[in-house]
Design a protein with these regions (language model features):
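Short beta-strand element of Class I
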Residues: 27-29
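Conserved Rossmann-fold NAD(P)-dependent oxidoreductase catalytic core, especially the SDR/UDP-sugar
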Residues: 96-140
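N-terminal Rossmann-fold cofactor-binding loop
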Residues: 31-35
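Structural motif
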Residues: 2, 66-67, 109
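Short, conserved SAM-binding/catalytic segment
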Residues: 37-48
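NAD(P)H-binding glycine-rich loop region in Rossmannoid oxidoreductase-like domains
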Residues: 50-92
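N-terminal Rossmann NAD(P)H-binding glycine-rich loop of SDR-like oxidoreductase domains
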Residues: 3-23
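Conserved catalytic-core motifs of eukaryotic protein kinase domains, centered on the activation segment
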Residues: 41, 78-86, 121-125
Length: 145
């Protein structure tokens, strides 16, 4: 199965990639804004040769993916707060890229996840492998998604 992961430098993307690393029938194509950071992470996890780390310019309609998983976001709540509504300009660019792909490949599945949706919006620092999910399901805030 060919899986494109957008926002591959995010903690939740990396957690998923580690869990996928035992599945040899998954062919992962990782896209990130910071390829150096992404390639360093791949090396630290001893996953060299297993994953295809690429710049977003390589994401195009001629590639065939069974699934696109979108983790694109800011990842740092302080940066996100400073950006205000401008954060949507960043995420919109990658959402549009994925949606254009889906128009041409209707069979491709699309999943979007954010740190806020996974961990809740009350975190004060970027998430890491020790972050615990705390979503108050009965009192959701805009930062929870």
């Amino acid at each position: 199965m060919k899986i494109a992961i957008l926002g591959a430098t995010s903690q939740i993307a990396q957690d998923l990639m580690l869990s996928f690393s035992n599945h040899k029938d998954y062919d992962l194509f990782l896209f990130g804004r910071n390829l150096g950071l992404l390639n360093n992470w791949i090396g630290r996890q001893s996953l060299d040769g297993s994953y295809h780390a690429q710049d977003y310019s390589y994401f195009n309609k001629s590639q065939r993916y069974d699934v696109i998983i979108n983790f694109v976001g800011i990842g740092d709540p302080i940066k996100a707060q400073k950006m205000g509504s401008d954060i949507f300009k960043i995420t919109e660019q990658y959402d549009d890229m994925a949606l254009e792909y889906l128009k041409q490949h209707k069979e491709t599945k699309y999943i979007f996840l954010s740190s806020g949706a996974v961990y809740g919006g009350s975190y004060q620092k970027p998430v890491n492998e020790n972050t615990v999910a705390t979503v108050d399901i009965n009192n959701l805030k805009s930062t929870d998604w």
